[in-house]
């Protein structure tokens, strides 16, 4: 069973918005500093890696382990939507590996910024699609 905050569109949307805001703030630090400011950029990227891992991927893991399982059982016909949302999670996981590898090897901050912007765009599209799904099936989920 997934927690009640995941099943309710409004509370779930607030979870997504909060983490998107944290990521945008850390990205502003990375994008705003001179590319030669190694120590500040390094801290910003490490913060972003931790946010992506500890908040976004952990949240995705919980959705897949509980919410998506419950939706699949309670709301027939959602398989294609759930597959697309899970694919978004997979893309974020793969990009996080790329970001972490870039951080630990080359430290090309322009590349890391691009990866973060790509991840954020995927996350925003994912959030919108997930909220649409919850609008369609929220009343069928246990509270």
Segments and roles (model prediction):
Residues 1-143:
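Small-residue-biased structural context
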């Amino acid at each position: 069973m997934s927690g009640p905050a995941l099943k309710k569109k409004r509370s779930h949307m607030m979870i997504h918005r909060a983490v998107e805001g944290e990521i945008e703030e850390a990205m502003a630090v990375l994008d705003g500093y001179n590319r030669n400011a190694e120590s500040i950029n390094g801290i910003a990227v490490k913060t972003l890696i931790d946010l992506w891992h500890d908040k976004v991927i952990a949240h995705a893991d919980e959705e897949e382990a509980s919410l998506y399982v419950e939706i699949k059982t309670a709301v027939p016909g959602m398989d294609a939507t759930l597959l697309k949302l899970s694919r978004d999670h997979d893309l974020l996981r793969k990009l996080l590996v790329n970001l972490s590898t870039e951080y630990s090897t080359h430290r090309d901050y322009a590349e890391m910024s691009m990866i973060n912007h790509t991840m954020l765009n995927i996350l925003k599209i994912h959030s919108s699609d997930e909220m649409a799904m919850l609008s369609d099936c929220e009343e069928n989920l246990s509270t």
